[in-house]
């Protein structure tokens, strides 16, 4: 069965003049028992909607008075009636002059006047008193005598008359009259039916075969024996009688009514014009029982006849398919072909039509994936539910979620069951970044890249300043380098590119990156300090990268310098000096006096010649990111080292998950350049984001290709993060249980460059202990912004700024949010300060420190003050801010604080041993002579992080 929505039912009610809002209609349906209706979009079955429509219509609209038939076997004809005025009949009307009454008013209705029976045969007519309309049925029910019937032949009869002989028609009068209806056939006597009071204005019809006598025309003789009747008003032939529907009982033959029909031209011009039906048209109505909740009603069956379908004709099977159950029931009750009374007729719907499933072509049922694909993406491509795929994977023994990544083999098994084929589609980066064969004829000599490494404060930057004849070290915070610096220096031996790496232990990653991109490593060791931990780390990084090491023993100008001891220590790490028969060049130098610097440059040039450092400047540029940062007004800035080709302004490049077009380039002196050859460092502007230091960069044909490569790398990185969820093991659960009570310090790290941000984050994470952990919520490059403050406020974190400052008004916002901002310029200061913050999370240890004792000698009760214990200090000192224990018979009976301390009459802070004083104890008034007062103080001890 079809359904109907609630808002459609509201529109149907609105057409009947009942306006209800959606909420009111839903509440009304709930009151009628349709609790499944939730909103105006809910649906109801057709029979339910029809029943609800009928009920609401019955409640909101007044029911019209039902037209009930007076009895079977008669025709009801509705006319416009007028009520003639009451006229008193004269005693002896003259036969020659007929009387004419004045025309009655149209508003007055005709009321029959019941007449009383006269005892004499020919009495004089007496005027009957005027009675109301309600008295007419009572008078009609009285049994009239034969004399009364003769006197009043036109009186209305409530009971059907007995069949009688046909009465001859009256003589024709002068005025033309309408044709009279044919006489009805005799019928057997019917049982009497109770009469009902007729409505106001109702005029009863004459009995069959009898008509009331009409007044004779002027000059016609009156009929003998007929009673005098009130004269009827003249009828204007130009006035049409009102047309109305006539009800016809099907068991009786129809009585045609002749009416004036409009001319043919008018009917052709307006064939279906709205308004009353054409005059002369006969409508056939049938009285049928009403539907649920309704009374009997008249049904127009003439339309069925015109269509050639008779009432009671069985409904065909095709028609029955388009009808609801209630519609079929109503058609069966009325014994006729069903015609909808209200609403539009529904178009029959085709039942049994199967949904046609459009299958994809074979070439479209191939799924091309790379290394993996998520369950949700696979379900969307195949058009199946993700839950079905997850259920199948669970049957295969794989517990996955909708966003989990599955490999190509597993996806092929799932796709095969649904008629799909999986093909691995590898993203070939070589298509966008092709490898060019080395052309020996195009190779040119490039400058060597030299990385200066060593321990902190061993003079690396000072040595570079001496080579560059600059003073970079004086401008560094704390005199230490905290990010990689790239410089190109012109020497008598040719251009050399130097990379200055930090020596602090936190910058291990920077040193490793420096070792990867360099050709030579200059290991700086202080002659007075010797080999240190970061020196050893630098040696390991250089050996791992396979780079030649030159050792510069610095600070030989100091009195405590011992170059031989340094050379001896380096032999432990397989670095043997040439003077001792080894292969490692070791030179004593001094950055202050510039001793040994020319010899160092000569050895660097010699090593570069041995290595034969050459590159092709005509190919697309490629290299490595040395450092990256985010500057206000300039955006992401990357310091790159060009290893191959020539980098030009306008080139499209890609590095990691970022891409862009080179907008500008600047060298280490801040000068803008248009192109940079191999072996030179440069700052690049125009990337989409801050790249990761150490990533490679490549120049591609256009920015579109760069974007595709970057998006591919970002997708692989996201898949790796989603697929890198480690399953919980028993060891992990035990480790989590051990650290369940551990305090955690949340941090938001912002630094000036990407390398520093990485180094600071790693250093702070290493500061975590078993008692307090460190969690980095966010680590980024740039100034501290409002977003960082909101992130810290949400995570209850501390913001750590390294060589960066907050933007304007950010400190006020942080103060309002209760966020602490710590700014540092030196990394070890940041680590020490964060350790203090970590210790502040631990609960302090409360330790009791004894101060002294006093013996109660006498007790004083002072009004409005309380009890005062006159005591003598026997040990130590008694302080007013201390705590006190009252001991009696070696038992502590009270513990509290000292409320007052006086010496004689003066308030004092403390009383030393051997003096007497008055002590008041807060909250205790039962001090007795001989009690001992032990005075002590509580001090908080910060616990250790270890």
Swiss-Prot record:
Residues 590-592 are annotated as: G5. Gene3D superfamilies: 1.10.10.2480, P-loop containing nucleotide triphosphate hydrolases, Translation factors, Translation initiation factor IF- 2, domain 3. It is found in: Cytoplasm. It comes from the Bacteria. GTP binds at residues 454-461, 500-504, 554-557. The keyword Cell inner membrane does not apply. Residues 102-165, 174-185, 212-229 have a biased composition (Low complexity). Residues 479-483 are annotated as: G2. Residues 554-557 are annotated as: G4. GO terms for cellular component: cytosol. Residues 58-250, 301-324 are annotated as: Disordered. NCBIfam families: IF-2 (TIGR00487), small_GTP (TIGR00231). This is Translation initiation factor IF-2. It comes from Anaeromyxobacter sp. (strain K).
